[in-house]
């Protein structure tokens, strides 16, 4: 099994992590280990990297790719559990944390995973294959209102109501089992003139279902705060997002952690006692260069936001 994954914003991420050779770093989304391999190159034997992934295929491939390194610990888990993971490893604080929230190239390119609307496969979309809940359960189990809600909110799809209606109508005849069956339903629901414009008509709906299956947005807010709590002073957190929903959450959470004061604006001094935990390094997100876009088109929607822990 070959886990091909071209890391996005690699140089920008490594630069912004401010890697110390004896530091401890966490790659929350190990994936193809593109970012991790570059971190490890910059660590001494006293440094350490913790690589977390909920996808066993990714961990297996990464362990093979990084087998020469002895200062690396693999963890099969969701990065939302970062506090517990580090506590179990007897690690109090770390120097840097990276999270690349995109679906890996491998997951998209491996048809059987069901992430892609370009290949026919069972409706799956589980990043953690140990989980029992899959895209099949969403498509065949959610009522019309709930389907509409996730497609609208997570996919930002203007035809969410029609798509939800068409899904429910189709599954009343027989279960919807495959990605291509779902693609056909989506295409039928979207008026022809809109199908001919812009990205693939199924893109937004597939994104929405994937987010729901893996509970991606629900865990992000808390995970950012937990991650910041585990950073040393001047430690950095780098988060790469791939759609506006994630980016908005990261941006707003960073702002909240930089300026948590809840006092009314007309009070001359803070009395709520909430102190800033970070300073935002990237006022605007870092995006892929024109050069990177040429060799890695999947970087087109990537945005990197960086924050630094401050002394409390």
UniProtKB/Swiss-Prot annotation:
Example GO BP: rRNA base methylation
Q: Quote the InterPro entries the UniProt record gives.
A: RsmH (IPR002903), SAM-dep_MeTrfase_MraW_recog (IPR023397), SAM-dependent_MTases_sf (IPR029063)
UniProt KW keywords: Cytoplasm, Methyltransferase, rRNA processing, S-adenosyl-L-methionine, Transferase
Q: Which SUPFAM superfamilies match?
A: Putative methyltransferase TM0872, insert domain, S-adenosyl-L-methionine-dependent methyltransferases
UniProt GO cellular component terms: cytoplasm
Alphabetical list of Pfam families matching this protein: Methyltransf_5 (PF01795)
Indicate where this protein is primarily found: cytoplasm
UniProt catalytic activity: cytidine(1402) in 16S rRNA + S-adenosyl-L-methionine = N(4)-methylcytidine(1402) in 16S rRNA + S-adenosyl-L-homocysteine + H(+)
The subcellular location is: Cytoplasm
Q: Provide the E.C. number(s) assigned to this enzyme.
A: 2.1.1.199
Binding-site list for S-adenosyl-L-methionine: 33-35, 53, 79, 100, 107
Which Gene Ontology molecular function entries are recorded, alphabetically? rRNA (cytosine-N4-)-methyltransferase activity
Q: Which family does this protein fall into?
A: Belongs to the methyltransferase superfamily. RsmH family.
Q: Give the protein's biological function.
A: Specifically methylates the N4 position of cytidine in position 1402 (C1402) of 16S rRNA.
HAMAP family, per database record: 16SrRNA_methyltr_H (MF_01007)
Q: Which PANTHER family match?
A: 12S RRNA N4-METHYLCYTIDINE METHYLTRANSFERASE, S-ADENOSYL-METHYLTRANSFERASE MRAW
Tell me what this protein is called: Ribosomal RNA small subunit methyltransferase H
Provide the taxonomic classification: Bacteria, Bacillati, Bacillota, Clostridia, Eubacteriales
Gene from which the chain derives: rsmH
């Amino acid at each position: 099994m070959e886990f091909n994954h071209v890391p996005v914003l690699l140089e920008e991420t490594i630069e912004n992590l401010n890697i110390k050779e004896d530091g401890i770093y966490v790659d929350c989304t190990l994936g193809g280990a593109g970012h991790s391999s570059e971190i490890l190159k910059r660590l001494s034997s006293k440094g350490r990297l913790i690589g977390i992934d909920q996808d066993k295929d990714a961990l297996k491939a990464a362990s093979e790719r990084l087998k020469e390194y002895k200062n690396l610990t693999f963890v099969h888990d969701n990065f939302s559990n970062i506090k517990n993971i580090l506590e179990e490893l007897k690690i109090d604080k770390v120097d840097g944390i990276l999270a690349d929230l995109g679906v890996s190239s491998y997951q998209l390119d491996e048809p059987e995973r069901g992430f892609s609307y370009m290949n026919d496969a069972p409706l799956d979309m589980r990043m953690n294959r140990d989980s029992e809940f899959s895209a099949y359960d969403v498509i065949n189990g959610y009522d019309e209102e709930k389907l509409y809600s996730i497609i609208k909110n997570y996919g930002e799809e203007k035809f969410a109501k029609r798509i939800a209606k068409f899904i429910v109508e189709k599954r009343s005849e027989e279960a919807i089992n495959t990605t291509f069956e779902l693609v056909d339903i989506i295409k039928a629901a979207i008026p022809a003139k809109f199908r001919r414009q812009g990205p693939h008509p199924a893109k937004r709906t597939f994104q929405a279902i994937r987010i729901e299956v893996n509970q991606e947005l629900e865990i992000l807010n808390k995970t950012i705060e937990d991650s910041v709590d585990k950073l040393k002073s001047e430690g950095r957190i780098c988060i790469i997002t791939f759609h506006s929903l994630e980016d908005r959450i990261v941006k707003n959470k960073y702002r909240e952690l930089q300026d948590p004061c809840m006092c009314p604006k007309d009070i001359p001094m803070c009395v709520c006692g909430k102190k800033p935990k970070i300073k935002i390094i990237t006022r605007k997100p870092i995006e892929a260069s024109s050069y990177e876009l040429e060799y890695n088109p999947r970087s087109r929607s990537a945005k990197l936001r960086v924050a630094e822990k401050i002394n409390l």
